């Protein structure tokens, strides 16, 4: 049941960044992790992908105008 949520058409793709990817993204955004929007460890998608506190998650949404919209979230309790 965990993985079924990831296949739903309204749930965008979520990817946990590794440490080097997270550092690169934070540098590009000129931001600290705490400045990112948050996602809870209890969020159903965070649970399904195995996100832990402190992880940065890349969310890729389909957009009719931009084709893709990418955002990042910091996982917190």
UniProtKB/Swiss-Prot annotation:
Catalyzed reactions per annotation: RNA(n) + a ribonucleoside 5'-triphosphate = RNA(n+1) + diphosphate
Gene Ontology biological process terms, A to Z: transcription by RNA polymerase II; transcription elongation by RNA polymerase I; tRNA transcription by RNA polymerase III
GO cellular component: cytoplasm; DNA-directed RNA polymerase complex
EC numbers for this chain: 2.7.7.6
Signal sequence annotation: none
Keyword Cytoplasm on entry: yes
Top-tier EC class: transferase
One Pfam family matching this protein: RNA_pol_Rpb5_C
GO-annotated molecular function: DNA binding; DNA-directed RNA polymerase activity
Keywords: Cytoplasm, DNA-directed RNA polymerase, Nucleotidyltransferase, Transcription, Transferase
Subcellular location as annotated: Cytoplasm
Disulfide bond entries: none
Family assignment from sequence similarity: Belongs to the archaeal Rpo5/eukaryotic RPB5 RNA polymerase subunit family.
Assembly information from the UniProt record: Part of the RNA polymerase complex.
NCBIfam families, sorted: PRK09570.1 (NF007129)
Function recorded in the entry: DNA-dependent RNA polymerase (RNAP) catalyzes the transcription of DNA into RNA using the four ribonucleoside triphosphates as substrates.
Record protein name field: DNA-directed RNA polymerase subunit Rpo5
Lineage: Archaea, Methanobacteriati, Methanobacteriota, Methanomada group, Methanobacteria
Gene (name only): rpo5
